[in-house]
Amino acid sequence: MPDQPLNRTTIPEKKLSNLPTCPGVYQFKNNQGTIIYVGKAKNIRSRVRSYFREGPHISGKTKVLVNHIADIDIILTSSEVEALILENNLIKDLKPRYNINLKDDKTYPYLVITNEAFPRILITRQVKRDGSTYFGPYTEARQLRSVLDLISTIFPVRKCKLKLTKENIESGRFSVCLNYHIHTCKGPCEGKQREEDYLRMIEEIKGLLKGKTGALIRTLSAEMHRYADELRFEEAAELKIQIEGLRKYTERQKVVSKDPVDRDVFGIAQHQDDACGVIFKIREGKLLGSQRMYFSNVDDEQHETLLRKCLEKYYLETPDLIPQEIFLPLPIDDDEVMALRELTGDINLRFIVPKIGEKAKLVAMCIDNARHHLEEYLIEKQKRGELSRIVPALQALQETLHLSRQPERIECFDNSHFQGTDYTSSMVCFVGGKPRKSDYRKFKLNSFEGSDDYAAMQEAVTRRYSGSLQDELPLPDLIVIDGGKGQVNTAWKVLQELGLEIPVIGLAKRLEEIFLPNTPDPYNLAKTSPALKLLQQIRDEAHRFAITYHRKLRTKRTIQTGLTDIAGIGEKSAMKLLEHFGSIEQIAKAEKEEILAVTGPKTAEAILSYFRKKQP
């Protein structure tokens, strides 16, 4: 069956047919005139028409996009590379809804060698097309510090901001600073260092930053020997220090390939709407570092599209670091290869998809790193999402309960007992809407006899807000009681007696009603209220903590009253038996062979003997 047209009623066939066949950028607009997608093409007409043809290659996201296209604008360029650069800039500026969003990496720093007489080496977060040479971005601050320390140690690069023109230097306008006297600068400001010597040093630094440490060491070694032969021992000694520093730096780099070819390795990982691309920079067989970039709004985009975005962005921003080979996890089309070769200025640049051996392992390692960084990114994204949920909940609590401030610290009490015995209370603490488990506390209650829920609450609140715990933990902004009117009033009275003005509320389970002290009628929050959802989360956590503690106490008492009386059985052995059989009754019914599966023959015999004596 031939391909069928999509959305042809919106975009007239005549308009599609009249589109030019040259390179450029196309912009899709919706019926409000908003640009919703930007793309680039070697042949605009062919590329745009492909969106309006039904077929297996059309993704769900593309179908949705096409259904929203009301108009098309184009911008012609002289080459596909110009189109690529323009597309990149337009996407950054316009952030169209249906484009893959590249997370802005402007927070990552670059090293820049300035385009001026006697260039300086600076850190910047903005890449400008000003003739300067940029290296980076450095996603790891430690890596950037390591490189800067190395350069400062072995290369006397000027650190001043002086405008060192030939006229300014010859006029004697400047004087050397402290850096000259401590031998970290050779004084070009006073003409003590020739510009050609300074620029030779800058080229050596560029070689270092490009990973050409082996070639640099060989060049410096030859120069050192020449100085020594010419009896210029001081200059030879300076070069020796530089060479030793370079060798130490090289030794710290991880060797990942036996052959000394310069390579970039790309890896991609995707999860639902997010993706991460990682690039390994390998120079002379050593891994110099890695860069990563994150994408959102990828939806059902194919990996080929994500890989293309990674390649384009990376080589747009780092045109001075082109390797001999680029390893990819999957192939890209020939047009993209040609565009990237034109972009980098290297028509011999090789794109390789390794299948076996060491090279394939490099790509696999890069993909593993992309997965790892994507997982970390998603965790952080989830945390940000939780924060965006928690802040409105805390604000709603403050407004609903008429609190003087936002309840940053909330403590919640829940009591537990078994048929009126083994009373316990748990207190959980939430700070900023999140559990702070280090501040959880549990209380074994024993100041009263029989079944008395109010006495239990009185003891728990008294013990928390008096004595050593009062000094050990900060006071909360809000106290939540798992209970109704009577429980809340009991807690409030204790606080009054202790002279504490802390807001306290109760949250009853059955109807999720909120009770305030000395107020007969409960307050009801909407079921969808973020404040109620946060209170429920805190209350449920207090209940979980209370039940866990109470169960542990009951188990311990069961052990002490039923098993530890048997010779040779301590608490650990008793716990092991209970975990295996489930109860003392089941242990009493067990055969010797069953008990031997858990303990030794002597202990098994003691258990059987103990329960025989208890039989009527």
UniProtKB/Swiss-Prot annotation:
Keyword presence, Cytoplasm: yes
Principal subcellular localisation of the protein: cytoplasm
Molecular-function annotations in GO: DNA binding; excinuclease ABC activity
Residues of the UVR domain: 214-249
UniProt-annotated location(s): Cytoplasm
Domain called GIY-YIG: residue spans: 21-100
GO cellular component: cytoplasm; excinuclease repair complex
Biological process annotations from GO: nucleotide-excision repair; SOS response
Assigned keywords, A-Z: Cytoplasm, DNA damage, DNA excision, DNA repair, Excision nuclease, SOS response
Alphabetical list of Pfam families matching this protein: GIY-YIG, HHH_5, UVR, UvrC_RNaseH, UvrC_RNaseH_dom
InterPro entries from the UniProt entry: GIY-YIG_endonuc, GIY-YIG_endonuc_sf, GIY-YIG_UvrC_Cho, RuvA_2-like, UVR_dom, UVR_dom_sf, UvrABC_protein_C, UvrC
Function: The UvrABC repair system catalyzes the recognition and processing of DNA lesions. UvrC both incises the 5' and 3' sides of the lesion. The N-terminal half is responsible for the 3' incision and the C-terminal half is responsible for the 5' incision.
PANTHER family, per database record: UVRABC SYSTEM PROTEIN C, UVRC/OXIDOREDUCTASE
Subunit organization: Interacts with UvrB in an incision complex.
UniProt family annotation: Belongs to the UvrC family.
Name of protein: UvrABC system protein C
The organism of origin for this protein: Prosthecochloris aestuarii (strain DSM 271 / SK 413)
